[in-house]
């Protein structure tokens, strides 16, 4: 074939398979491929155009298309090929190539029909063909295509083999599918057939089985009855045997002894036969009767008493011949009697009668032979007659002897036999009649007995099958439970290994991240590292420069969810951890650069900024103190500044966890000063702190860095809106001249105004007291994480407070990418480190070491005793107090009302409501320990007052001073007529209604009055009535005035008169006669001359005063006046008032009640005007300061009223803590100390204020209710005013950030659950600036819940020491605490020592039995209902605590 013919007729020359076949499914191997590669079967790649077709295409592109009509021969050949192609095939062509489909054939572009060529194009093609034909060698015929042809054949074979293989796989798949479907169909049919068969035959089978079971049960009972009968037979026969042997031993006659021995032998044979039947050996005969003979119901016979044996007549051969009765021996007769008795006893017991067994034919034959022999022997021989006289005499003598001896004897025997026979017949008749009646009586009874037996049988059968089914069910459940437990154990082991690999991956990832950060910093400084990051399984050594190279940024990053933690080989996990760590470092650096470049798309948050490098390995670059910082940094503070600067330059977040009081604030301020001075970065900086420290931050920034401007962002919503105008603006450039550089605000305000803070790109965000974000689920944590900031710095003195979960929250906040949503890491922090629930202690120690390696790089912590030598020591003392009687009664009553066992069982269930109830109980016990008045205050008591008090609608309109004098009046009023109360009822009072008042006044009051001056004068001149006036030093006018004065006015006048006579009598000490002669006009003034009050006034000391005031001095000396009155009246009432319709009595009563002179005389209260006049006129105040006429009350406590006010002394002694605190404060006050007094409850602070007021101690107070603007002034007052002795604070509000170095004593009235909260509170005084030793007193009530809480707090402190300080874990018993036992531990706090010991003993016994003590059936369901894990700290501070 020539090349021209190929070009002229490509369609005709192309073979049908080539035209119909699709392009090959596999890519042809290159020319240099090996035979192994050629023969390898691979999945078919996308189709491609063969090289030959490609050449044809190229030629078609070069040559114009020409249409050449095929010749007739070619046309015929094409038709044959078309017919062959149109025949149906089985999918395989002749050359072994799969037949192409229609769609595949139509997809080839070069098989499409060609267009018609022009004549010029046809001529050109023909010329070219002629040239090709005339050439020396054709391209087709010339060699050079052998290799392509071989390759083509190889591809065809490979396609054929592949097609065959695919068809085989498809056939196998179809066969498997068909078999599966067929199996399912057959299974359905079989199941349906089984159901039909069960439905059809289930009832019959059940009935048949039940019938068989009933029959089996009957047979079993019959066997049991037969067995009991045989055992009874053995017992009776054994008794008979023993009795026979005993009789044989006692018998004297040999025949009788032989008889008894035969009976014993017979009984032995029967015993042997019965035992053989019991043992299962088939006896030749059934033992069914007592004797081998049948029972004789007719009685005994006398045939045995014949002298001679008469042979019975032989039976005739005929069936109906007469039968003679055989003779019976004594043994047979006795046997018949015994049989009769046995039959009678059987009938009495309703037992079946024993029937005599049939004798063997052999025995019958033997009996017959014996009878025949006896008959033969008994026939006597004929005797010859012999008669003699002696014979006859002997014969007669014999008959006489017979008649005398034998006949009576025989008669007696015969009569006895007859009577015996009659008696037996009578008994037999009675038995027969009784038995006949029994059949009639037993008809219904037997039916009832049958029913009862059937019911009892059914019950027994049901109980048996139920018991059997229960046992089988228990065994099946036990097997299933064991199988499930083994499967759970295996699954738990697999899951534990998987979790361990997850944890190793996470820890290795963080360790490698820390290692890469350290290498990069050291590489930048030109210092080769020599430290190693040690893990539990591998050790990463820096080594050579090409190891762990950071330039390998193209390493594949694997998601945590895509990792295979089930594989045993951990090489892939280590490689993935290394790649992820490298990628995290690169992302952190890129984001830091992007933030500095101001790219908007990277301004969201640098969540990948992490740092795990130890501050000592961050390099040896020494950074000097900024010049704009006015304070002088200490050495350790300068080191902290270097660490913070390196963190910022690398874009890494960190935790500054120095102990409280070492200057975390000044170090943070120095970082901002460094950035402003060196890098010209003036902000904006964001400082978030607790509300109590906001003023402190503002003051210290202004004080130490005056060039940095602070914007205090707090106040009301309106104030904050005005402040936002300074910073809530776009495109603000922060320079030295900016309006502000640092914004200081609180956590609460950040959450409220989070939408405004998120708009600003903060250069540095500093969180003071970062334990405020210890919960990663809180809105505060999420809002702060969403802020756009370049770096974050957390300041905290206590990174671990209650548990390790809080430390993990801080780590999650500063590096959320590596730790985000990793529950395994969280569980490791909160479970394995804190509780060590696993038994593998070595694994826990390795994890603890790796935790230290993770914490060291990015957390800097220094302790005071290591860095600050000039700071005074801190001494902690636990002061134990005892419960008072009232506290002990309250505590015992509370504990008796609570069941400790019930609480522990509820704690094992773990319901949230039960946990809250338990915490409320703990709060009640703590209240009792603090002060019983927290439950019930001692109220003010007073008698029931039957009176009416003044009322007012509002005190506002009453003014500043409300006058309520004499506002109390009796509810009883005595009404009087107007005539009596008015002037009309008075005789001497003139008025419109009294026309005779002048007459009566003139005559009655003057003329007829004996005290008239004229009458007194006339009577005193001689020895009249008033002649004594000259001896009593009284004039006429004085007597007249006293007659017109009342008794009260006379007493007041007598009180104002000086006691001159008695004083003179005391001073001169003269005789009475001499004094009387010296002063005759006072002769009759005996009382004034001998008044003892003058002696008391003159002699103020010495024995004379004691002798004159014996009663008063004894009363005062014994303290009777200060004793509280033991009895108070039940009711009290003011005097009954008089009422009238007239106003006259009201005016008169007011004149009497509000008389100034009377009130002054009674109470001796001089007015301000009188005191001013005495001072101005320089008068002697003694006459104007006379003692009150109203005597002093006997009781100083009660005074003039019966109102009982609670005693403050009792208030102090009712609480053991307060009594101990009273002694302690007295000593501290005398020593010149100043005290910080911390409380957990604000109500206790209220009570403490009353106590301090009672003791006159000056104090100030700060708790959660103190306003923000007042806190700064309160702290400043305590710091600047030394007279303030006590500062009352709540541990939560007053324990954060404030500086109280003026105090050198800290007292915790009640301790916090969290020991770090107390540590923060005591460091308010023990911090920089404190030059004295700080003493910390902690009041603990002995033997109560507070002592157990303190022990738990010490364990928490040990956890912090182990994790943060890197100490050994030997001091903490981690194995005794897990997540489920926290609530149970709280319940154990409520128990006393005896109850706790009993509960621990029961727990030990439960563990020995393999049970869980206190667990109930609903425990798992209740545990699943818990929505969240409530910590002790959260539940404790929900109940009336000081709010932070």
From Swiss-Prot:
Family annotation (SMART domains): DEXDc, HELICc
UniProt GO molecular function: ATP binding; ATP hydrolysis activity; ATP-dependent chromatin remodeler activity; DNA binding; histone binding
Chain ranges of the DBINO domain: 398-523
Cross-referenced PROSITE patterns: DBINO, HELICASE_ATP_BIND_1, HELICASE_CTER
Any one cellular-component term (Gene Ontology): Ino80 complex
Reactions catalysed according to its record: ATP + H2O = ADP + phosphate + H(+)
E.C. number(s) listed in UniProt: 3.6.4.-
Positions with a binding annotation for ATP: 658-665
Biased composition (Polar residues): 29-41, 101-110
Localization annotation: Nucleus
Complex and partners: Component of the INO80 chromatin-remodeling complex.
Domain remark text: The DBINO region is involved in binding to DNA.
Family designation: Belongs to the SNF2/RAD54 helicase family.
Protein name as it appears in the record: Chromatin-remodeling ATPase INO80
Upper classification of the organism: Eukaryota, Fungi, Dikarya, Ascomycota, Pezizomycotina
Chain's gene name: ino80
């Amino acid at each position: 074939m020539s090349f021209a013919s190929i070009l002229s007729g490509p369609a005709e020359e192309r073979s049908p398979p080539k035209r119909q076949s699709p392009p090959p499914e596999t890519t042809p191997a290159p020319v240099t491929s090996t035979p192994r590669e050629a023969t390898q079967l691979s999945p078919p790649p996308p189709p491609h155009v063969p090289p030959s077709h490609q050449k044809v295409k190229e030629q078609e592109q070069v040559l114009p298309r020409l249409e050449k009509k095929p010749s007739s021969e070619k046309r015929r050949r094409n038709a044959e090929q078309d017919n062959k192609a149109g025949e149906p095939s089985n999918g395989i062509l002749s050359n072994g190539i799969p037949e192409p489909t229609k769609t595949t054939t139509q997809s080839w572009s070069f098989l499409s029909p060609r267009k018609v060529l022009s004549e010029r194009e046809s001529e050109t093609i023909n010329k070219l063909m002629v040239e090709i034909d005339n050439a020396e060698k054709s391209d087709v015929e010339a060699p050079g295509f052998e290799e392509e042809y071989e390759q083509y054949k190889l591809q065809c074979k490979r396609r054929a083999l592949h097609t065959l293989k695919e068809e085989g796989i498809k056939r196998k798949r179809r066969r498997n599918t068909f078999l599966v479907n067929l199996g399912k169909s057959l299974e359905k049919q079989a199941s349906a057939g089984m159901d039909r068969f069960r439905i059809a035959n289930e009832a019959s089978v059940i009935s048949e089985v039940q019938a068989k079971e009933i029959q089996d049960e009957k047979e079993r009972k019959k066997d049991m009855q037969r067995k009991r009968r045989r055992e009874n037979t053995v017992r009776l026969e054994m008794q008979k045997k023993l009795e026979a042997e005993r009789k044989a031993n006692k018998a004297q006659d040999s025949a009788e002894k032989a008889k008894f021995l035969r009976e014993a032998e017979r009984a032995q044979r029967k015993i042997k036969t019965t035992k053989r039947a019991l043992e299962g050996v088939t006896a030749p005969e059934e033992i069914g009767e007592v004797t081998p003979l049948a029972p004789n119901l007719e009685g005994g016979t006398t045939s045995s008493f014949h002298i001679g044996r008469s042979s019975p007549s032989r039976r005739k051969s005929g069936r109906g011949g007469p039968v003679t009765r055989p003779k019976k021996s004594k043994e047979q007769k006795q046997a018949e009697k015994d049989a009769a008795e046995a039959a009678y006893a059987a009938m009495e017991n309703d037992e079946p009668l024993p029937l005599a067994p049939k004798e063997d034919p052999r025995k019958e034959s033997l009996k017959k032979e014996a009878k025949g022999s006896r008959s033969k022997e008994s026939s006597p021989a004929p005797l010859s007659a012999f008669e003699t006289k002696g014979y006859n005499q002997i014969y007669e003598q014999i008959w006489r002897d017979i008649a005398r001896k034998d006949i009576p004897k025989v008669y007696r025997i015969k009569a006895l036999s007859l009577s015996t026979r009659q008696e037996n017949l009578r008994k037999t008749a009675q038995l027969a009649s009784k038995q006949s009646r029994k059949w009639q009586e037993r008809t219904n009874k037997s039916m009832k007995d049958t029913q009862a037996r059937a019911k009892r049988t059914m019950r027994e059968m049901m109980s048996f099958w139920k018991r059997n089914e229960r046992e089988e069910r228990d065994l099946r459940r036990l097997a299933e439970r064991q199988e499930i437990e083994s499967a759970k154990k295996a699954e738990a082991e697999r899951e534990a290994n998987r979790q361990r690999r997850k944890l190793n991956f996470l820890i290795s990832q963080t360790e490698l991240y820390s290692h890469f950060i350290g290498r990069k910093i050291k590489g930048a400084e030109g210092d080769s590292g020599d430290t190693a990051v040690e893990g539990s399984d591998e050790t990463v050594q820096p080594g050579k420069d090409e190891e762990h190279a950071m330039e390998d940024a193209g390493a594949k990053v694997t998601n945590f969810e895509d990792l295979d933690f089930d594989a045993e080989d951990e090489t892939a996990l280590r490689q993935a951890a290394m790649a992820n760590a490298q990628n995290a470092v690169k992302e952190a650096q890129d984001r830091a650069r992007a933030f500095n470049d101001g790219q908007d798309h990277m301004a969201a948050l640098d969540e990948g900024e992490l740092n795990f490098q130890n501050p000592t390995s961050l390099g040896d670059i020494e950074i000097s103190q900024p010049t704009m910082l006015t304070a002088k940094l200490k050495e350790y503070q300068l080191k902290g500044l270097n660490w913070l600067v390196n963190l910022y330059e690398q874009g890494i977040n960190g935790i500054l966890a120095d102990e409280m009081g070492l200057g975390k604030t000044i170090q943070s301020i120095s970082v901002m000063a460094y950035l402003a001075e060196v890098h010209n970065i003036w902000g904006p900086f964001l400082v978030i702190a607790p509300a109590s420290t906001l003023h402190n931050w503002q003051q210290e920034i202004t004080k130490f860095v005056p060039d940095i401007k602070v914007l205090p962002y707090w106040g009301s919503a309106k104030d904050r809106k005005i402040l936002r105008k300074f910073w809530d603006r776009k495109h603000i450039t922060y320079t030295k001249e900016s309006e502000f550089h640092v914004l200081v605000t609180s956590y609460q305000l950040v959450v409220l105004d989070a939408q405004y803070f998120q708009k600003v790109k903060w250069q540095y965000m500093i969180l003071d007291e970062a334990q405020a974000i210890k919960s990663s689920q809180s809105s505060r944590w999420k809002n702060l994480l969403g802020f756009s900031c370049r770096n974050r710095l957390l300041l905290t003195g206590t990174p671990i407070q209650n548990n390790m979960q809080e430390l993990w929250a801080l780590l999650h906040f500063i590096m959320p990418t590596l730790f985000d949503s990793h529950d395994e890491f969280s569980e490791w922090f909160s479970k394995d480190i804190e509780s060590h629930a696993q038994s593998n202690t070595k694994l826990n120690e390795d994890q603890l070491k790796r935790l230290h390696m993770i914490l060291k790089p990015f957390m800097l912590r220094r302790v005071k005793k290591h860095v600050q030598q000039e700071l005074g020591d801190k001494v902690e003392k636990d002061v134990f107090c005892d419960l008072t009687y009232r506290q002990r009664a309250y505590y015992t009553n509370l504990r008796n009302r609570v069941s400790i066992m019930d609480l522990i069982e509820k704690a094992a269930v773990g319901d949230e409501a039960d946990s809250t109830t338990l915490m409320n109980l703990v709060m009640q016990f703590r209240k009792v320990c603090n002060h019983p008045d927290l439950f019930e205050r001692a109220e003010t008591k007073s008698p029931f007052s039957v009176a009416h008090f003044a009322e007012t609608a509002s005190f506002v309109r009453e003014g500043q001073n409300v006058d309520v004098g004499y506002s109390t009046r009796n509810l009883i009023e005595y009404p009087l007529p107007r005539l009596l109360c008015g002037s009309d009822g008075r005789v001497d009072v003139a008025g419109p209604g009294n026309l005779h008042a002048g007459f009566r006044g003139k005559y009655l009051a003057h003329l007829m009055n004996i005290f008239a001056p004229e009458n007194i004068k006339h009577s005193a001149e001689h020895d009249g009535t008033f002649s004594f006036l000259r001896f009593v030093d009284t004039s006429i006018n004085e007597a007249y005035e006293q007659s017109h004065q009342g008794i009260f006015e006379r007493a007041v006048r007598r009180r104002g008169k000086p006691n001159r006579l008695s004083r003179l009598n005391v001073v001169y000490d003269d005789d009475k006669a001499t004094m009387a002669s010296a002063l005759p006009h006072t002769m009759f003034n005996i009382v004034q001359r001998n008044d003892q009050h003058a002696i008391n006034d003159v002699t103020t000391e010495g024995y004379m005063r004691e002798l004159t005031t014996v009663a008063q001095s004894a009363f005062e000396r014994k303290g009777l006046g200060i004793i509280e009155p033991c009895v108070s009246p039940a009711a009290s009432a003011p005097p009954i008032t008089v009422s009238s319709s007239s106003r006259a009595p009201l005016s008169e009563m007011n004149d009497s009640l509000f008389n100034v002179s009377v009130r002054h005389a009674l109470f001796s209260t001089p007015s301000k005007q009188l005191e001013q006049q005495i001072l101005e006129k320089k008068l002697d105040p003694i006459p104007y300061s006379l003692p009150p006429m109203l005597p002093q009350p006997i009781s100083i406590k009660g005074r003039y009223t019966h109102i009982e006010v609670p005693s403050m002394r009792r208030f102090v002694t009712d609480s053991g803590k307060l009594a101990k605190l009273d002694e302690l404060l007295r000593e501290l006050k005398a020593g010149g100390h100043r005290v910080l007094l911390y409380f957990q409850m604000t109500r206790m602070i209220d009570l403490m204020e009353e106590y301090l007021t009672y003791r006159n101690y000056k104090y100030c107070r700060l708790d959660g209710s103190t306003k923000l603007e007042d806190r700064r002034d309160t702290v400043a007052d305590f710091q600047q005013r030394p007279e303030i002795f006590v500062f009352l604070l709540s541990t939560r509000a007053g324990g954060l950030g404030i500086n109280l170095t003026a105090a050198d004593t800290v007292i915790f009235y009640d301790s916090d659950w969290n020991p770090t909260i107390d540590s923060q509170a005591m460091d308010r005084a023990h911090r920089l600036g404190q030059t004295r030793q700080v003493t910390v007193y902690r009041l603990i009530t002995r033997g109560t819940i507070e002592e157990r809480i303190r022990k738990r707090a010490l364990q928490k402190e040990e956890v912090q020491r182990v994790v943060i300080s890197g100490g050994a874990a030997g001091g903490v018993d981690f194995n005794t605490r897990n997540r489920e036992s926290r609530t149970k531990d709280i319940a154990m706090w409520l128990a006393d020592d005896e109850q706790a010991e009993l509960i621990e003993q029961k727990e030990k016994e439960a563990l020995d039995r393999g049970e869980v003590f206190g667990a109930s059936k609903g425990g798992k369901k209740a545990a699943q209902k818990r929505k969240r894990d409530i910590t002790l700290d959260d539940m404790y501070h929900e109940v009336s605590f000081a709010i932070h």
